[in-house]
Each structure stands twice: as C-alpha cells, then as structure tokens.
Amino acid sequence: MEKRVFRRKIYNAIGEWKRKSNGQTALLIEGARRIGKSTIVEKFAQEEYRSYILIDFNKASQEVKSLFNDLMDLDFIFLRLQQIYSKILYDRQSVIIFDEVQTCPKARQAIKYLVQDGRYDYIETGSLISIKKNTEGITIPSEEDRIQMYPMDYEEFRWALGDTATFPLLQIFWDKKMPLGAAHREAQKNLRLYMLVGGMPQAVNAYIDTNNLKAVDEAKRRIIRLYEEDFIKIDPTERVSKLFMSIPSILARNVSRYVPSSVIGEVEENKEMELLKSLEDSKTVNMSHHADDPNVGLPTTANYDKFKLYVCDTGLFITLAFWDKDFTENVIYDKLLTDKLPVNLGYVYENLIAQMLVASGNKLFYHTWPKDEKHYYEVDFLLSRGAKLCPVEVKSSGYKAHASLDAFSAKYSSRIKDRYLIYTKDFAREEETLYVPAYMTPLL
C-alpha cells in the first residue's frame, strides 16, 4: 500500500506558530491517535527546517527517555540525540519533535528549559495529554502553545481524491445563497462517500489504493481496536471502552442525553467524571453540552452534567455502529451508497454534522425543553455568531418539517440571527428558515 502524505490545513497553522513564536514557545498538537499528527509534523520539519530529530516516545529507548531526567547539561543531551539519531542540529534552523509525548512526562516537563535554552524549536504531539497518569509528578510547561488536530475534514478528503474545485465553488453558492441545481446530486453523492470512508488517513489511503469499502472497513477496525487497547490501559475494567463503543447505540435511541450509568452501571460520581475526562482527553469523541439558557455566551449556560457524545470521525462511527457484524452485514454502506438511508439510521447524519461543526472551529451545544408530559423539543446544535445564536436542526432526509426550530424561534426570537435546517436536498430559503444541504455545513 502506497504511503501518502495528505495535504492538511493544520500545516499553515504550524507555520503561523513558527513565525509568531520565533523560538519563544513549543507547539503541542493534540488529537486522537491515527489522525496524521506525526506525518504532517514530520513533513513540516522536512520542508521548513534545515534538519530535525523525531523522537517517537512509543518506540524510544530507555536511554533516550532517561536523557530528560537530568537537565543540568543540555549540551550533553543534544550531543547524545545527534549521535543516536545520526542527525546534525543547527542553531535556530532545526526542530526536535516529541512524538506521543504523553508517554514520557519528563520530556514534556523539560520543554520549559529547552525553550529557554533557545537553540532549537520544539513540536510535541500527543493524546491523553491531561489525564492524571500522564501529568503526575511533573510541572506542566507554560511555554506551550496548543493546537487541536482532527481527522481529515470533508474538504481535506476531497483534496485527497484530487478535487480542489468543490469547496471554492460551494463557497460561492453559499455566499450568494443559491441552490446548486443539477450539481446537487453529485455533491450529495460525494458527501455520502466521505461519510462511509471518513477522515482517518489510513482509511482514506485504503480507499484510494483499493476502491474497496471492505478494505476501508478493515482499516477502520484496526484503528478502533487500537483505541480499545488505549482505553484498557487507562481503565482495565473496560468502562472507558464501553462508554466509547456504545455511542452509536445511545444516539440511535434518540434520547436527550448520554447517561453513563446506562452503559457502565452506577459508579461514584468522581469516578464517573474521571472516566469521562479520560474519554474526552483521548480526543476520540466530540462532546456536546446542554445549554440550559441558550444565549450568546453558550459556555456560561452549559450544563456539564447533561451532554451527548459523538464519535470524532464519521467513518469510524459507521464501523462502530455495526461492530459485531461482518462487513457484508453493515447495511449503512449499501443504504448510503444508494441514497436509501432509512429514517431510523438518521443518527449517522447527526454524528457527521457534529464532526463537521467541530472541524470548523465550533464548540458543540444543544438545547431541549418540554413539549408536553411525554415529549420534548430539541435543537440539535446551537452556533454562536456575533451577538446572536443560530439554531440548527438536522434531518437525514429531504423533509422540511422543523417543529423544534419553530418552537425555539418563538421562544427566543430576540436572540436569533439565522436558523438552519440541515438536510439532504438542495439549498432553499423559506421565510426565516435556511435549508442547507449537509455538504455546506462547514460554511455555516
């Protein structure tokens, strides 16, 4: 299988850090495993520096790790690294990469003194950066700038397939609030392919190499098994793993919140919070919090005890939804490819939209309130735009019913800028509602 280095948007963000920091801070890139952190950082090092050393702390020898236990002689540390990795480092022209830095906390603590030394730049990558096991006994360096990295978004996926035209064109149509017309069907078909393959580079690579969704599914299963192994290292009782693996089944129930006890049973509140924090810190999930009083300052009204969980990648989500079934039994592949996804599988779109919104820089919030004694209204997502809110309702079909949007707009009319219904048909505007095809979600 050919190893490809895909074009990623974060490359420009790393370049911006290098220019602004000028050696005054290290850069920490956080994100789930297997999203391409190491690959893009190494590509940046190759193209933007005279030389680099990449230390993968998952593979590094004990000698390399022990170098960071005593920082009294930095000259010796740099000399040994150059010998071990057969690289020459040049003052202000080289970068040292700490890959999977969470597995060597002492190296992360050393960043403070390495940055102060000033000879080289430092880029760290990792996940599970903040959990107790990976921070116990060390001082977190303040000389760190952080960037969050995600699986390949829809535009990056199109780039990987050689399509650089779609998004500039979509932007034009969005700016003019125009439907695509005859081009809509093709645009929607392309989105459905992204939903199935997802944005994990290994899965995208498998698709490009084989044009075979079974091979793609196998690549995604390997990633999920890796996540399971990580979760078991954190919590040998497998509760973190269960919280992750159950996300599709919880979303399928269309309930207003994720209740951990329904998955792992009753545990002490502090322990439940610790398990959820570990899951969130793995960056494998996107968490949406309930906004009790939806207003422009959404975080200030967030209820952190009431939340929903989404899988960080649409492709992984689809594999996870049919985890116990053979690939041939995963009906989502066939139904999505043929555009016949039944309503009871609509949660696939909800997870997709959550991922798209997060990749576009949005924090996730939602809002529910009683309709009557047995039913409730729900706005799937709330976006903060200027001094106003944009409520978002997601449909997995072309239906234009939007009772929750209407009720929300009536209740909070003075707080609303635009109201969106994301669905599978072409762009349209009817009265106050903008009907947005799912592939335009990144432009909201």
Predicted regions and their residues:
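Structural recognition of the conserved hydrophobic beta-strand(s) that form the central parallel beta-sheet
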Residues: 97, 121-127, 148
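Short glycine-rich substrate-engagement loop in P-loop NTPases that contacts/grips substrate
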Residues: 59-92
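Hydrophobic anchor at the beta1->P-loop junction of P-loop NTPases
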Residues: 29
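Conserved lysine of the Walker
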Residues: 37
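A cross-kingdom feature that marks ATP-driven nucleic-acid transaction machinery
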Residues: 2-3, 18-19, 25, 34, ...
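Short regulatory helix/loop adjacent to the ATP-binding pocket of P-loop NTPases
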Residues: 113, 130-146, 158-163
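Interdomain hinge/linker elements that couple catalytic modules in large macromolecular machines
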Residues: 162-349, 363, 374
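Conserved catalytic segments around the Walker B and adjacent sensor/switch elements
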Residues: 46-63
